């Protein structure tokens, strides 16, 4: 894709507010939309009140990066603080889920409640017709039974597709959303950033919890949840260690268990299989671990999901689909056996590994993301 080929004008002066994080993806998003004729306003969202100096410095640098890009691209730039909304709508639920022994995905809730709700509402007060972000996904308008309908699709760059995190978006949100990066690959995004002289062209992608950053997770969680150490047991009841609190562990976890030196089953060559978290017993505060990646306790043929959210506003028909139970997982063949506005059940053709309560099960029909729910 050449830069010249991007100089078209489908925007025709329409106003769009771009969520600018200071990273390369949102920066190129703003530039692309400006090239397409949109009236672009860049908006930096502060969604976490900094509680240490290093995080303050990181957030400040991101803000400076975003403002610098807006100046280079030639768009207006604003700053808004959504910390109160994030705390009430996302972080409180995040802590409730961990307290209940589940492993939530705050990025899913953050997208639904902050980036595409609080941000969208604010953009509308600025007279915008659309919002845009640097997510790798696509939106497609089709003729539905009751008029125009919007579909959420995977990005063309499958290695960067983020539709999994966006599956809770509804028709109203999708109708106002643009994902310019959904049609191009990440390598092209960095090339564009380099060609137009963006100083953050080589900036590392963020991988931390949504708006909390890349800090030691156990240390962070320990500030908000009480620790209650307990026993680590095998399925046979053998005590192999002590845990720091069930909230700090997730199904399938291998590192940080402190049981590496414990003898268990061994292979023919005398080496031992790794230990994995397999279950949590909240009532008795017991963490169960098993040896071997493919231990039966780690495999599931079925799942139930609650708090279902369907992109089309209605549950899909009962038939075969693909599903993800974690990000970056290949779609697993499954059958949707029961579905309603509030819950659904899936059966899988092949056993699924470490299906984790609190994570999202997301349903796909080819490239079309149908929605999903929270694994029970």
Swiss-Prot record:
Keyword terms of this UniProt record: ATP-binding, Cytoplasm, Disulfide bond, Nucleotide-binding, RNA-binding, Transferase, tRNA processing, tRNA-binding
Reaction(s) catalysed (UniProt annotation): S-sulfanyl-L-cysteinyl-[protein] + uridine(34) in tRNA + AH2 + ATP = 2-thiouridine(34) in tRNA + L-cysteinyl-[protein] + A + AMP + diphosphate + H(+)
Main location: cytoplasm
Site (Interaction with tRNA): 135, 359
Disulfide bonds: 110-210
Family, similarity comment: Belongs to the MnmA/TRMU family.
HAMAP family recorded: tRNA_thiouridyl_MnmA
Full protein name: tRNA-specific 2-thiouridylase MnmA
Organism, scientific name: Bordetella petrii (strain ATCC BAA-461 / DSM 12804 / CCUG 43448)
């Amino acid at each position: 894709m050449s830069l010249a080929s991007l100089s078209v004008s489908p925007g025709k002066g329409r106003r769009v507010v771009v969520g600018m994080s200071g990273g390369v993806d949102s920066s190129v998003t703003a530039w692309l939309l400006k090239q397409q004729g949109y009236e672009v306003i860049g908006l930096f969202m502060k969604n976490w009140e900094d509680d240490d100096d290093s995080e303050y410095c990181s957030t400040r640098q991101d803000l400076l990066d975003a403002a610098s890009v807006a100046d280079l691209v030639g768009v207006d730039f604003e700053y808004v603080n959504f910390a109160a909304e994030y705390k009430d709508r996302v972080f409180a639920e995040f802590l409730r889920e961990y307290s209940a022994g589940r492993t939530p995905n705050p990025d899913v809730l953050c997208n639904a409640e902050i980036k595409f709700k609080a941000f969208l509402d604010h953009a509308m007060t600025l007279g915008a017709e659309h919002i845009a972000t640097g997510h790798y996904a696509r939106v497609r308008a089709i003729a539905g039974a009751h008029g125009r309908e919007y579909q959420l699709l995977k990005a063309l760059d499958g290695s960067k597709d983020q539709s999994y995190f966006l599956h809770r978006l509804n028709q109203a949100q999708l109708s106002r959303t643009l994902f310019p990066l959904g049609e191009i690959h990440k390598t092209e995004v960095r090339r564009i950033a380099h060609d137009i002289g963006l100083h953050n062209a080589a900036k590392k992608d963020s991988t931390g919890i949504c708006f909390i950053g890349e800090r030691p997770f156990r240390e962070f969680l320990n500030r908000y949840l009480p620790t209650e150490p307990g026993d680590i047991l095998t399925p046979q009841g053998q005590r192999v260690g002590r845990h720091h609190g069930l909230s700090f562990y997730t199904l399938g976890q291998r590192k940080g268990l402190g049981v590496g030196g414990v003898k268990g089953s061994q292979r023919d060559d005398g080496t031992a299989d790794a230990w994995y978290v397999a279950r949590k017993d909240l009532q008795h505060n017991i963490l169960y671990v098993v040896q071997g990646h493919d231990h039966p306790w780690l495999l599931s043929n079925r799942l139930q999901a609650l708090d279902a959210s369907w992109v089309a506003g209605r549950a899909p028909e009962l038939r075969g689909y693909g599903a993800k139970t974690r990000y970056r997982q290949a779609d697993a063949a499954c059958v949707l056996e029961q579905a309603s506005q509030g819950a659904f059940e899936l059966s899988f053709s092949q056993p699924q590994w470490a299906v984790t309560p609190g994570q999202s099960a997301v349903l796909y029909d080819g490239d079309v993301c149908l929605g999903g729910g929270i694994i029970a």
